[in-house]
Curated annotation (Swiss-Prot):
Taxonomic placement: Bacteria, Bacillati, Actinomycetota, Actinomycetes, Mycobacteriales
Protein name: GTPase Obg
Gene name of the record: obg
Organism field: Mycobacterium tuberculosis (strain CDC 1551 / Oshkosh)
Domain OCT: residue ranges: 363-441
Region (Disordered): 21-43, 439-484
EC number of the protein: 3.6.5.-
């Protein structure tokens, strides 16, 4: 029985994140001997755990997400009496390789994670609900309700790994890119004499005197790669960060219609069809404007050496440095190494100095102060907005006082006024979030509460405590009865 093949290198995954929900607040009254009417003492719910990506230099692939695409953080604990707050849910820290790019469902760039220890909050945990002690105020002395915890953020994200390298090697299959990486660095990629030997990017560290740089070898391109031929353009994401692009050309190929000039032109056409994901500060500029160099490979073959010398000047007229090398005999590898090192230095020196950024990157904040009210086409209305929808999630609809508190909040926000302006009548259906209810202006919160105002207790306003004179008279009556 053959087992299914397991990929060793994964550079693009879709994951599903769900942060922890906040704990519910507690509605309780302080109970202690000789302390009647102790007042509310319900604690707040704990914050839900967030999902945080952390760059780890020891991680080099997104393979773990291929097997475990669902990430869930712990929820917060509920509040308790005696002013005890619930424990916060633990954050789920997930290790990702350097160069990971986070995209939302619409393909919008959320974060470009570069640098060991860089953190990104992928999904925020829900806030804990307030207990009745926190809801107490001058006019609401004894709330008989608490708020529910908010739901944690849940969303689907796409993770793409874009290799962090200084030099990117591009070329046709079997042009000798992997052999070049192996010859100038300590990397040991798979090398064989057939097309598409390289199926995953290979990285190598190259020493150039006192300096060092990294080289990325991506799978070979062929004409039509932008239309999906061969391995397509998927692996070109790994050269988006490269400061220098190097065309590796096979001068010893015997394929009809192939020559160094046409190979370079075909590759440039495919590169022009590629649309980078990184934009703005995260990008190094358009690939078309990136510095180029050309490596004419396999000059250990006599015919290849003649061809390389013949086309060298024509290629140099484009303003690109040209290196004629042989990875088999290691001829001219040192000039190539130091030439690439100088190109990297010149390119980095010409770039503007990057402004240091905070190590923690967060999604774009959303203004939750507004709302909209629209007719639903069936005689009802739909209220949309982050704040009213969050209030709905916080409300325990089994508690009349909590429902009344929700009505007060919506009225203060202006929802009731807007409904009246649009012609809403008592009893019409109003939908907020996932809840649909019959709307009543200033909905009462229960008969006992309505008599003395929401969140108050008539017992607190009365004064039925026995005074000293009354206690003295009572003792006198007891003594008289005892003597009789």
């Amino acid at each position: 029985m053959k087992g299914s093949s397991v990929p060793r290198f994964v550079d693009r995954v879709v994951i599903h994140t769900r942060a922890g929900s906040g704990g519910n607040g507690c509605a309780s009254v302080h109970r202690e001997k000789f302390k009647p009417l102790g007042g509310p003492d319900g604690g707040n719910g704990g914050r839900g755990g967030s999902i945080v990506f952390v760059v780890d230099p020891q991680v080099h692939t997104l393979l773990d997400f291929h097997f475990r695409p669902h990430l869930t953080a712990a929820s917060g604990k509920h509040g308790m009496g005696n002013n005890r707050d619930g424990a916060a849910g633990a954050d789920l820290e997930v290790k990702v390789p350097e160069g990971t790019v986070v995209l939302d469902e619409n393909g919008r760039l959320l974060a470009d994670l570069v640098g060991a220890g860089t953190r990104f909050e992928a999904a925020a945990g829900g806030r804990g609900g307030l207990g009745n002690a926190a809801l107490a105020s001058r006019v609401r002395k004894a709330p008989g309700f608490a708020l529910l915890g908010e739901k944690g953020q849940s969303r689907d994200l796409t993770l793409e790994l874009k290799t962090v390298a200084d030099v990117g090697l591009v070329g046709f299959p079997s042009a000798g890119k992997s052999s070049l990486v192996s010859a100038i660095s300590a990397a040991k990629p798979k090398i064989a004499d057939y097309p598409f030997t390289t199926l995953v990017p290979n990285l190598g560290v190259v020493s150039a005197g006192e300096h060092a740089f990294t080289v990325a070898d991506v799978p070979g391109l062929i004409p039509g790669a932008s239309r999906g031929r061969g391995l397509g353009l998927d692996f070109l994401r790994h050269i988006e960060r490269c400061a220098v692009l190097v065309h590796v050309v096979d001068c010893a190929t015997a394929e009809p219609g192939r020559d160094p000039i046409s190979d370079i032109d075909a590759l440039e056409t495919e590169l022009a069809c590629y649309t980078p994901t990184l934009q703005g500060d995260a990008a190094l500029g358009d690939l078309a404007a990136r510095p180029r160099a050309v490596v004419l490979n396999k000059i250990d073959v006599p015919e290849a050496r003649e061809l390389a010398e013949f086309v060298r000047d024509d290629i140099a007229q484009r303003g690109w440095p040209v290196f004629c090398v042989s990875t088999a005999t290691r001829e001219n590898l040192q000039p190539l190494i130091f030439g690439l090192s100088q190109m990297i230095s010149d390119y980095n020196a010409a770039r503007p100095v990057a402004v240091p950024r905070r190590p923690v990157i967060r999604p774009i904040p959303v203004d939750d102060s507004g709302f909209t009210v629209e007719p639903d086409g069936h005689g009802g209305f739909v209220v949309s907005g982050a704040r009213p929808e969050r209030w709905i999630d916080q409300t325990n609809f089994d508690n009349d006082e909590a429902v009344g508190y929700l009505a007060d909040r919506l009225a203060r926000l202006g929802v009731e006024e807007e409904l009246l302006r649009l012609g809403a009548r008592s009893g019409c259906a109003v939908t907020i979030g996932e809840m649909t209810f019959d709307w009543e202006p200033q909905t009462p919160a229960g008969e006992p509460v309505a008599m003395s105002g929401r969140g108050t207790d008539p017992r607190l306003d009365s004064n039925k405590r026995v005074g000293a004179a009354e206690r003295k008279a009572a003792r006198s009556r007891r003594r008289e009865h005892g003597d009789g």
